Amino acid sequence: EKRSPQALLEKWGENWQIDQLWFKTYPYCSAAAGIADAAYQLREELDDPNEIKQILLFFHPNADAALIYRAVQKPSEGRFSAEYLVAAILLGKRLDFQHFEQAECEPDICKLMTKIDRLYQATPENKRAVTIVMRLKNGAVLQAQSDYPKGSPMKPYSGEELNQKLAQAINNEA
């Protein structure tokens, strides 16, 4: 169907909303948003990070393609590392913009990263779903899942949360 320039301008400006817009929650790769959401859930349940024996990260195949670093040399690489981000979150690190400007990986983050493995599990109904399974030294198993990251069209911010996000961005905060 051909459209004239006049027809294109008829409803110009009526609705500037972008359909299915995602709002980025964290100051690192958006491909890690779901795994970060799950890690923050687990941090609430974890009493002592020293009790962690093993952590398994489950992704849909290729859903982690942008998360190219499994081991990092410096925090700037950690922006693209599921292992780094999960370790830092579980250790209670503040992952703001300044964190990723550090020259070296903090030893406790690097140590915890060695206990983390990525696995792949096809989830045809939701390719964004991620799961973290954490085994503790006492035999307990903790698990958290994120079906859709906060800020996605399926789990959108409220108006108040959007205003807070804007205020943080203006103040250069994470």
Please name every model-derived segment.
Residues 1-174:
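Terminal-appendage/accessory-domain detector
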